[in-house]
Amino acid sequence: MRHLIEEYGIGSQSFEAVKQVLKEQGALLQEGMILDATIMHAPSSTKNKKGEPDPEMHSVAKGDQWFFGMRCHIGVGAASGLVHSVVSTAANVHECNSAAERLHGEEKVAYGDSCHLGIEKREDFEGSSCQFRIAMRPGQRRALPDALKGWLEDLFEMAKAHLCAKVEHPFRMSKHQFGFQKTRCQSIKKNDDNLKMLFALASLYKIRK
């Protein structure tokens, strides 16, 4: 069954179908978007017929640790917290490189963590009217002056962080409720299809009431 689902891209089709229904019901508002990504570790046991690790997966450093696998980039509605877009890449692909695919072009504002700093200068967003409200780097925030201006900037950073926390819900659902903490099969495309199915279910779960 799983192979049939992967072969026909049922996960991607389900994700688009759920998204369309949510739009028609007015649940998936498009004026604001939150951008984020997470690394999906590829276990060494997931090997091809030659006994080699998946060649599409790559290593990347995050802090002082190295990870091998893929990166799942998502765009989440700032108002609804529902997943609007999913882009899967090798782990070494920077988050800014997938930003244009995660935004639909009608946003008035987009939020993201400090990994997205400088996004507004990219060619993809030249002439865009979207406001990019990207978090400061932790070191910059710690260095804010202990004065009124610094306090106000820190409050603004707190507000952005509180809003961006909405993006953690679909990641938590996919990893903990649905158990997708590591890649499940060969190829980024197949894992992407699995993830889209889970994010569709996460959106339905979120609006169940």
Regions flagged by a language model, labelled:
Residues 1-131, 137, 198-204, 209:
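Polybasic low-complexity intrinsically disordered regions
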Residues 108-109, 114-193:
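Helix-centered, glycine/charged polyanion-binding patches within enzymatic domains
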